[in-house]
């Protein structure tokens, strides 16, 4: 097809020829970025026959991800769990973290152990699915002559492996801060041994409150007002025109997600639980949605997309602005401590 011709012909052009084309046809400069992207990866473009073969294998190669998605979002069911008083609580992907945030340690332990015991019952299926994913990644990396699957994964984002390695090294070099935080959490919770089901529950008690979706939207709008009237007007339109699928439902995928489609606008998936964490999730995902909307509005389709390393800047910025707003508004020391500890645990957990 035309796309294959495009990928084969562009790398063959010399830099001088391209410079002349840009000078003779200035409208081509709109496509300079995608052209450079194709040429940058010329060493990994194969013969027409090989490219056709890899293209036809693409749908098959997506099978591990598709299988896991159907299993996890549609077929998997968790049994109810009991709290310290013996009452049953529903366990789903959407309720898992809120249950782990409970002050009832028995409930936290039961939720954690039941969740992973249920997944463990499918360990062989999950292992085989993961193995299939590894094999397809290795196949395409080898086929395109990358030295490793890591090089292949990072190439599209133009992030050197050295940057990836330095991030890991930086985390390891600063683990002493994490150890201090974990020790503080264990001491404040008053437990002899800190378990994974203890790392979500607030260590400043009696501060968490129910925050409705309407309240959360209003607070997020206030917090992001510093970004200007144009931004908040479009954000309000996104709320009012139902860009968001808000509440959990049977068969709905867990977590939160923002689609980056250009028309008519991005769509945001949430699993609202009416708490502070959900409020931050709204700010985070609408950061993605606004980024996509504004990028598509002000740039041509060929340059409007962005890589994950850039995407998380917009979403994390919104979270930071929301945290700043909440801290500035609060005068209660306990509430401020709760907010700071929440953000510390979120950073450690990497919920983004």
For the regions a protein language model found, what residue spans apply to each?
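A well-structured
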Residues: 1-206, 217
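Post-HExxH zinc-binding segment in Zn-dependent metallohydrolases
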Residues: 306-333
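Conserved small/polar residues in nucleotide/adenosyl-binding loops
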Residues: 2-9, 343-348, 352
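Auxiliary, metal-adjacent structural segments of Zn-dependent hydrolase domains
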Residues: 207-262, 275-276
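Long, amphipathic alpha-helical stalk/connector segments used for oligomerization, subunit docking
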Residues: 327-345
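Short pre-active-site segment immediately N-terminal to the catalytic Zn-binding motif
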Residues: 269-282
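Post-HEXXH active-site segment of zinc metalloproteases
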Residues: 292-313
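Catalytic glutamate of the conserved HExxH
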Residues: 281, 285, 289
């Amino acid at each position: 097809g035309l796309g294959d011709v495009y990928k084969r012909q562009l790398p063959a052009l010399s830099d001088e020829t391209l410079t002349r084309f840009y000078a003779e046809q200035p409208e081509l400069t709109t496509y300079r970025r995608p052209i450079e992207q194709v040429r940058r990866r010329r060493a990994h473009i194969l013969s027409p026959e090989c490219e056709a073969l890899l293209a036809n294998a693409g749908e098959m190669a997506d099978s591990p991800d598709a299988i896991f998605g159907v299993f996890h979002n549609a077929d998997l069911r968790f049994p109810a769990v009991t709290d310290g008083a013996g009452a049953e609580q529903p366990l789903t992907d959407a309720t898992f973290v809120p249950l782990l945030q409970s002050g009832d340690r028995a409930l936290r332990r039961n939720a954690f152990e039941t969740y992973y015991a249920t997944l463990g019952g499918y360990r062989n299926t999950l292992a085989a699915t993961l193995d299939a994913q590894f094999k397809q990644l290795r196949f395409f990396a080898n086929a395109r002559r990358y030295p490793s699957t890591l090089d292949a994964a990072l190439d599209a984002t133009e992030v050197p492996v050295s940057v990836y390695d330095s991030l890991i090294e930086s985390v390891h070099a600063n683990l002493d801060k994490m150890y201090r935080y974990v020790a503080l959490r264990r001491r404040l919770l008053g437990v002899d041994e800190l378990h994974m089901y203890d790392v979500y529950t607030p260590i400043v008690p009696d501060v968490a409150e129910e925050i409705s979706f309407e309240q959360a939207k209003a607070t997020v709008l206030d917090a992001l007002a510093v970004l200007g009237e144009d931004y908040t007007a479009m954000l309000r339109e996104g709320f009012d025109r139902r860009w968001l699928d808000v509440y959990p439902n049977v068969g709905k995928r867990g977590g939160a997600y923002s689609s980056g489609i250009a028309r008519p606008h991005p769509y945001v998936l949430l699993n609202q639980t009416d708490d502070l964490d959900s409020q931050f999730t709204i700010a985070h995902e609408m950061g993605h949605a606004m980024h996509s909307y504004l990028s598509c509005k002000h740039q041509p389709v060929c340059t409007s997309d962005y890589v994950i390393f850039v995407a998380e800047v917009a979403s994390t910025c919104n979270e930071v602005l929301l945290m700043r707003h909440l801290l500035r508004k609060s005068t209660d020391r306990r509430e401020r401590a709760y907010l700071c500890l929440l953000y510390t645990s979120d950073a450690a957990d990497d919920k983004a």
